[in-house]
Amino acid sequence: MSNKITILLAVLLAVVACAQAHASHQRRVPYPLPRFLPRPHHTVSNHRIVGGFEIDVAETPYQVSLQRSKRHICGGSVLSGKWILTAAHCTDGSQPASLTVRLGSSRHASGGSVIHVARIVQHPDYDQETIDYDYSLLELESVLTFSNKVQPIALPEQDEAVEDGIMTIVSGWGSTKSAIESNAILRAANVPTVNQDECNQAYHKSEGITERMLCAGYQQGGKDACQGDSGGPLVAEDKLIGVVSWGAGCAQPGYPGVYARVAVVRDWIRETCGV
């Protein structure tokens, strides 16, 4: 009898351990649907910012929609007349010929102009498991024509610090909530940056936050980027400080959004595209 009890307890402990490991792993997931790394065969729905407001693209003229087969999959930011910055998990496994960007429109499905991607330069240290170094540069086939609705965003200096608690704006065509709700209009939300140690504590079960990441959001939740916003801009004081990367759900209390920190790869951006 005692041997049977011992075996039963061992089995129960193994089940609990597996469940905990699964829950921990599920916390670290990138933003495109279906919350796993996108592949060319995936179709990403029109999900958008949680707890935000509709805006005209003229208010965020650096915003682009990254598309595959004429479908919005991620956001991105204009760096120059030829280069876009997005998230590596948005382009991982993709060929340039399969991607286009739409610029100058508040709708990801119409208006503005559509430019083909000529080259993808994914950060060489990108890690699919930890979503570290989540950066990808896209070279466009033709030079952009700037207007009040298409403009490059300024970049921080290499290793420029981001203060805790400063207000930022994140924009995109991602989900307005954690469930599906289609809408093609550009949205934005204002969220404060979060102390690195506090964010590390929130995500300690999923290996924590690296130096290439920064966090923004409210302790009570309610406002955040979500599926479909990945690769899009996090801007503070008219500078691109972050790239929408990953999180635990969308706008969940105690779990701020996690962004790829732009300042730590400023030199790589300059070396790659001369910006």
From Swiss-Prot:
Query: Could you tell me which residue ranges the Peptidase S1 domain spans?
Result: 49-274
Q: Name one GO biological process term.
A: digestion
Enzyme Commission code: 3.4.21.4
Q: Which cysteines are joined by disulfide bonds?
A: C74-C90, C199-C215, C226-C250
A GO molecular function for this record?
Answer: serine-type endopeptidase activity
Q: Which InterPro entries match?
A: Peptidase_S1 (IPR050430), Peptidase_S1_PA (IPR009003), Peptidase_S1_PA_chymotrypsin (IPR043504), Peptidase_S1A (IPR001314), Trypsin_dom (IPR001254), TRYPSIN_HIS (IPR018114), TRYPSIN_SER (IPR033116)
**Chief localisation class:** secreted
Q: Which domain of life is it from?
A: Eukaryota
The Gene Ontology CC terms held by the record are:
extracellular region
Tissues where the protein occurs: Expressed in the midgut. Expression levels drop a few hours after blood feeding and pick up again 28 hours later.
Question: Which Gene3D superfamilies does the UniProt entry name for this protein?
Answer: Trypsin-like serine proteases (2.40.10.10)
The record places the site described as Required for specificity at D224
The UniProt keywords, alphabetically, are: Digestion, Disulfide bond, Hydrolase, Protease, Secreted, Serine protease, Signal, Zymogen
Task: Cite the PANTHER family for this sequence.
Answer: GH13245P2-RELATED, POLYSERASE-RELATED
**Similarity section:** Belongs to the peptidase S1 family.
Job description of the protein: Constitutive trypsin that is expressed 2 days after emergence, coinciding with host seeking behavior of the female.
What name does the UniProt record give this protein? Trypsin-4
Which species is this UniProt entry from?
Answer: Anopheles gambiae
